[in-house]
C-alpha cells in the first residue's frame, strides 16, 4: 500500500522539528574572540561586587559557616544565627561574632559567580588579585570584593573605598581607575560609592554628592541591579525569605539594614494595590504603614515568636522595644538611601552600562487582599484567593524582567514604555543597556552576558 504525499509531510515536519530541537545552539568561542587582546598591557583591574546573599558568613570564634553552610543547613535551617546584634545606644548593627570571608560561588549545586570568574581567567586573561600583593607589569587582574551583605550599604561602600585604595597601592599608582562589575544589590552600593565614597549622607535630607568615583572608576557594569528597588524585597521582608525547605524569618531580616534598602523607590511606580485593582497611596518607608498592616516586627505572630526566645517577660519586652526602634531608624535611613542614588549630578565622568533579563514575568505591584480580617500580601495573580471579575491581575501585578528585578527598575524608569521619560526626580545617567533571557540568579553564568562583558571591559 502506497502512502499519499499528504500523509508523509507531517511525519517529515515532525522529524525535522525534533532534529532542530536536539541541535545545540551555537556558542561563541570566547577564548578565540578575546585571546587576541592579550598583548594589551594597560588593562585596568576589574572588581567584582556580589549581591545580597552573595558572600559566605562565618562565626569569628570557631569558624562555623553561618551562611550558606552545609546542604543540611540549606534544606532545614531557619538561619536565626544570621541575625545582627543591635547597639542599644546608636541603634546600629554590630557583628562582633561573625564576618564575611568568601564569595558564594556555588551552593547546593547552583553556580552563582564561579562561571564569570572562570571566563575572566580563561578568555579575558585576568588573574586573581589579592589586596596587598604588588601587581606585575602588564598583568591583568580581577579582584573579588567580599562584604557582609547584611550590613548597611553605606558601610559596604566605605569598605569598597578602602578596598580600591589597597588596589591602587598594589599598582603603585595613586591615580589608577578601576572597572567594576556589580550584580544585583552590589550595584546599589557601587552607585552610592560613585556619588559619595565613604561619606554617610543619610543622617539628614541634604544628600549632597561629592562625585567620589570621578578619579577612581572608569566603567561600571550593573547586572540585574534593582535600581528602583523590588517589591520582592517587601514580600520577603513580611513573610521571610524561602531557603530550602524553610525560611529566613522576618525578625532576622529586620536586623539587616541592607534589606530595607531594596524596597521600591517612591518614584518607581505603584508598588501596592487592592484586590479590586485600585492603587494604594502608601509610603513603603513609613513605619506607621507597617504597623497599620501588622507586618514584620509589628505582626502579633512574629512578636509572640520572639517572646518565646526569652526566659522572662521583661527581657522579651526590652528586646521588642529595641527591635521596634531599630526598625524605625533603618527604614528611614533606607528612604534616604534610595533617594541618595537618584539626585541629580553635575557631571558623570564614569561610563555606566546596564545588563539584565527581560524574558520572565516579574512582580511589579503587590496586592493586599483582605481575608478573614487579615491583610494578605499577594505577589502573583495565581495567589489571589477571591479574584474580582474584570480585574486584569497579570497586567497590574507583573512586568517583564528576570523574575526578581523588573526591566523598568533595572533601567530606573517608572514605566516599561521606553517612550516615557524617566521621572524628573530620578537621575540615572545610563550610557547603554543590553538584555538577555536569563533568571536573576543565573545572569552571571549566561554566555551572552559573558561575551558582552568581555567586549565592554576590553574595548578602548
Where are these predicted regions, by residue range?
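Intrinsic-disorder-associated interaction segments
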Residues: 2, 109, 252, 282, ...
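Bacterial N-terminal signal peptides that target proteins for export
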Residues: 2-12
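Short, aromatic- and cysteine-enriched interfacial helices/patches
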Residues: 3-4, 76, 292-293, 309
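Bacterial N-terminal signal peptides
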Residues: 10-21
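N-terminal non-catalytic accessory region
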Residues: 20-181, 185-266, 270-285, 289, ...
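Serine-hydrolase catalytic core
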Residues: 278-293, 297-298, 302, 306, ...
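C-terminal subdomain of alpha/beta-hydrolase-fold enzymes, centered on the catalytic histidine
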Residues: 307-460
Amino acid at each position: 500500500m502506497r502512502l499519499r504525499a499528504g500523509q508523509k509531510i507531517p511525519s517529515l515536519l515532525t522529524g525535522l522539528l525534533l532534529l532542530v530541537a536536539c541541535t545545540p545552539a551555537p556558542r561563541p568561542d570566547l577564548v578565540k574572540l578575546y585571546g587576541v587582546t592579550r598583548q594589551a598591557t594597560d588593562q585596568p583591574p576589574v572588581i567584582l561586587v556580589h549581591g545580597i546573599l552573595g558572600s559566605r558568613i562565618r562565626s569569628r570564634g570557631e569558624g562555623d559557616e553561618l551562611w550558606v553552610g552545609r546542604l543540611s543547613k540549606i534544606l532545614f535551617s531557619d538561619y536565626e544565627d544570621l541575625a545582627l546584634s543591635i547597639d542599644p545606644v546608636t541603634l546600629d548593627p554590630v557583628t562582633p561574632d561573625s564576618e564575611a570571608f568568601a564569595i558564594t560561588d556555588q551552593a547546593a549545586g547552583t553556580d552563582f559567580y564561579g562561571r564569570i570568574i572562570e571566563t575572566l581567567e580563561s578568555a579575558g586573561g585576568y588573574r586573581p588579585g589579592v589586596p596587598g600583593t604588588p601587581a606585575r607589569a602588564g598583568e591583568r587582574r580581577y579582584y573579588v570584593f567580599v562584604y557582609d551583605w547584611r550590613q548597611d550599604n553605606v558601610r559596604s561602600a566605605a569598605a569598597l573605598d578602602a578596598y580600591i585604595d589597597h588596589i591602587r597601592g598594589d599598582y603603585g599608582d595613586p591615580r589608577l581607575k578601576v572597572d567594576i562589575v556589580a550584580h544585583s544589590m552590589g550595584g546599589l552600593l557601587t552607585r552610592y560609592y560613585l556619588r559619595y565614597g565613604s561619606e554617610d549622607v543619610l543622617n539628614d535630607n541634604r544628600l549632597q554628592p561629592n562625585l567620589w568615583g570621578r578619579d577612581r572608576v572608569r566603567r561600571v557594569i550593573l547586572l540585574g541591579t534593582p535600581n528602583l528597588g523590588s517589591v520582592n524585597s517587601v514580600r520577603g521582608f513580611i513573610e521571610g525569605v524561602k531557603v530550602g525547605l524553610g525560611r529566613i524569618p522576618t525578625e532576622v531580616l529586620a536586623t539587616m539594614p541592607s534589606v530595607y534598602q531594596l524596597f521600591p523607590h517612591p518614584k518607581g511606580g505603584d508598588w501596592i494595590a487592592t484586590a479590586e485593582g485600585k492603587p494604594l497611596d502608601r509610603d513603603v518607608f513609613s513605619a506607621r504603614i507597617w504597623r497599620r498592616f501588622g507586618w514584620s516586627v509589628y505582626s502579633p505572630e512574629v512578636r509572640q515568636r520572639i517572646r518565646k526566645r526569652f526566659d522572662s517577660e521583661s527581657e522579651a519586652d526590652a528586646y521588642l522595644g529595641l527591635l521596634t526602634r531599630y526598625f524605625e531608624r533603618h527604614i528611614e535611613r533606607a528612604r534616604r538611601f534610595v533617594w541618595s542614588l537618584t539626585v541629580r549630578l553635575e557631571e558623570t565622568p564614569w561610563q555606566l552600562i546596564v545588563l539584565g533579563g527581560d524574558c520572565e514575568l516579574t512582580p511589579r505591584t503587590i496586592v493586599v487582599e483582605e481575608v478573614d480580617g487579615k491583610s494578605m500580601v499577594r505577589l502573583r495573580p495565581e495567589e489571589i484567593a477571591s479574584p474580582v471579575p474584570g480585574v486584569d491581575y497579570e497586567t497590574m501585578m507583573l512586568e517583564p524582567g528576570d523574575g526578581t528585578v523588573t526591566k523598568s527598575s533595572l533601567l530606573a524608569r517608572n514605566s516599561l514604555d521606553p517612550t516615557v521619560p524617566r521621572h524628573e526626580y530620578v537621575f540615572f545617567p545610563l550610557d547603554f543597556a543590553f538584555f538577555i533571557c536569563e533568571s536573576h540568579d543565573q545572569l552571571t553564568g549566561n554566555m551572552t552576558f559573558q561575551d558582552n562583558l568581555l567586549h565592554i571591559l576590553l574595548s578602548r
